[in-house]
Structures are given as structure tokens and as C-alpha cells.
């Protein structure tokens, strides 16, 4: 959490329980839980967040809300032109540094409703908690890497992914936010 509610979120990496009870059979006790944040074994993993455009969309443009809020993130944008190669390079660098890495889109949830989807996704790996965020951040349209350092106790990590100028472009944030992206690739029917 950064203290800036547009950038940091105390709910990140935590399981938010709106209204539930936990039964402790050894003590025969039922404990009510109301609006609590529960840490997980993965609450201190590291994430690298980026804005992502759904590749299945034929056309994309930023909403007025995105334009307004995202200009505060900085004046420059790094556009990844080859996402598959970018992901491959980051995964190789993470593996070489001894970290497990996962990449996925962020799912957004209503914090006033206890939904089963988040808990269900944690069954596939507790690290999936990094891909859940309150719906007040949906405008960020994030994709993320989560890096799992294992037992290592560090406050940050740095990865050398090498020169990426062949798969990226640097443009002004204003230009990026006013762009209209058109997908010329044929989209397969399911």
C-alpha cells in the first residue's frame, strides 16, 4: 500500500471476507467474521503490473475515466508490441534468478459480496490471490506478473530482462491514452 488509493490498495494479496463464520472444532467455537482481510501465504509475493488490452477485441480505445485517472501515473508509456516475447523474456529472467513467475489478467470483484470465484481460484494455487482486485480499480485493466521468491525474505526484487527495444515503443502517455487500437488479426470463432 502506498497511501495513494489510486496506486496502492490494502486489499491487495489478501482474502476479503465480507460476512462469514469460522468453526474451530477443537474448541467447539464459532467465530463470526465481518469485513476482515486475511493474509495468505502469498501475501508478500511481488507483482509487476501493466495495463493490458484484451487481444480478442477488434477495436479498443480508452474511456474518459481511464484517460483522467491514468494521466496521474506518469507522462510516458512503454508499449509492448510483442506480448508473447515479453512474457517469455520475463519468465526466463525470473527462472534464472530463482523465482517462480505467473502471468495473467486481473479479475475484479465487488468487495460487498462474498464470491466463490476468488476462493475457487485459490484452489489452483494460493498465488492466484495476486490476480484479484476490488472493482473500484477496474479502469486499470491490469495484467500482472507475480513472482514467488519462496523462503527468501527480501523487500523487493530486480530482474534483468535485457534490452527490449526490439519489442517495445516509448510514447507519451497522452498519445497512448488517445490511441485507438485496431486488431487486424482474424479472430477465431469458438
Q: What positions do the PLM features span?
A:
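NAD-dependent ADP-ribosyltransferases
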Residues: 1-190
